[in-house]
Structures are given as C-alpha cells and as structure tokens.
A protein has these predicted regions:
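Active-site bordering "gate/hinge" segments
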Residues: 1-150, 154-160, 166-169, 247
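Dual-mode signal for accessory low-complexity, basic/Gly-rich regions
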Residues: 125-268
Length: 268
C-alpha cells in the first residue's frame, strides 16, 4: 500500500415525523453510522485503488476499524497486475455489493412511476415469470436494526412484509398513493421507495459458485449506469477477476458487461 484516499467516519440520528389532514400524526427515531476506508496499492504493474466500508443503525454493530482496513488492503492489492480481455461470452458472477445494482433496476422497473408512464421493461408482467424459478424476493420493513426499516411510508400508509418475487414470478408492484391511483390499484406502502429488500440466499457461498462456474468472470466493481429502463438493455464498465478451472486466475479491468436484464434475470 503506497497511499490512501482517506477514511470517513459518519454518524447521524434523527426523528421522522409525518402528519396529514386525516388526523394522522406519527413518527420514529432513526440512526445511521458508517466507517469507510480507501487505499492505493502499487507495484511494477502500476497502481490500483479500492476500499471497504461498514454501515449500521447501531454503532456497536459496525466492523472494527482494523477489519475494514484489512479488507480495503486485500481488495486493492489483489487488483494489481490487472489485464484486459478480448470479446467473449462467458458466465458472470456479480459479487454481492455490486449485485445490488441489478435489483435496484428491478425495483425501478416495478415502481408505480415507471409503470404509469409505461417506461418499464417489466410492463404487464405481474403473475408472469421474470426471474429464474429459484429466486424469491421480499420487502421486510420491520427488521430490527435494519437501515431501511419503517412503520409507514412517506404517505403515512402502513408498511408490511411484501412478496415481490415468488419462485421467479412477479407477484406485486411497489406503489405510492399517487401512482396507485394512476394505475387504479391499491397503494403498497412504498411512497419513498422500498424498505429492506431481501433476496433469499441460495445454498452455495461465493467459493462454491466459482468452482461450479469453472470458467468465467467474477465482477467486483462496476462503473457508470448503462441501463435502459424501457428496454432492459444493460451495458456497464466493470473490473474483477478471470476464473479458470474453478479458481481465480488473475484480475481484469476495462471490460464491458453487456446483455438484457429480462434475459439476465431469467438465467440467474
């Protein structure tokens, strides 16, 4: 490690309070704490930058500063000597922190604003297969100490556990009061967004997935936001690792991942 882009410690707390002319007034306390570290690794091949962070409602639930520094160092040093790749079509594993972007695009596609504007690649897909059949996704707004927990949404509508995907089938949308009225549907308690999206974990950990894939790409970082929410076309810059014979072979950079989300979701 030759240098650092610095470290950040942030802590926030407050009260969300909402009232309306229907004699509703209520609120809840919230807090958010984060520690972040970014380092620069250098050798004869050049320099690489990476980092790590921990974020939680309860400060005591944060990773230790030592562990955050160690993970930032590991991630930066393992990127040294990164190579470029020729055009190819191979399986891809998205590391958990970057895989969240795939699900953010999904939530945007099933949000009321996208649907009533007819600007979604998942139009008219309710009760149809949109993910592989082993995928289950729920919204659980009442998880203790979770960052997205909330008793009601920005309209004052009570939140509740909400099944979005069951065995790959789209079961419901995410709607505010306004978008629900535009669509002639009932609000789902999602004014202001979703609260604690939970993707049911599979039976394999990352190492098992790498072994099963045998040859392909492990993506650990994404650049840009090349997603067309109307067509589902997906094209983003990426870096990560080339997998060969079920093992990490070497780091890669300056690559582009391209496809279409409708097909990507169904082939998870």
């Amino acid at each position: 490690i030759s240098n650092s882009d610095g470290s950040v410690v942030s802590t926030y707390s407050g009260i969300n309070l909402y009232g309306n002319t229907n004699d509703f007034i209520n609120g809840w306390r919230w807090s958010s704490h984060m520690i972040e570290c970014t380092v620069i690794a250098e050798d004869n091949s050049g320099m690489q930058r990476d980092g790590w962070y921990s974020k939680a409602c309860d400060f005591d639930d944060l990773q230790s500063i030592k562990d955050i520094g160690k993970e930032a160092t590991r991630r930066a040093t393992t990127r040294l000597g990164a190579r470029k790749l020729s055009t190819c079509e191979v399986p891809v594993i998205f590391e958990a922190p970057v895989a969240s972007g795939l699900f953010s695009a999904f939530i945007t596609a099933i949000s009321g604003a996208s649907l009533y504007r007819r600007a979604s690649f998942l139009l008219d897909k309710k009760d149809k297969q949109v993910f592989a059949n082993q995928i289950n996704i729920t919204e659980n707004p009442h998880i203790k100490k979770a960052l997205g927990s909330a008793p009601f949404d920005n309209d004052g509508v009570a939140t509740k556990k909400h099944t979005l995907i069951s065995e790959g089938i789209l079961k419901d949308y995410v709607l505010s009061g306004y978008s629900a009225r535009k669509l002639g549907l009932e609000p789902t308690g999602n004014a202001g967004g979703v609260h604690n999206l939970v993707v049911e974990p599979g039976k394999m950990d990352l190492n098992d997935m790498i072994v099963e894939m045998n040859k392909g790409l492990l993506i650990t970082d994404m650049i840009g936001f090349g997603i067309n929410q109307i067509t589902g076309d997906y094209s983003r810059g990426a870096s990560g690792f080339w997998i060969e014979n079920g093992e990490i072979a070497y780091p890669v950079e300056e690559i582009t991942i391209a496809g279409n989300l409708t097909e990507m979701y169904k082939n998870i």
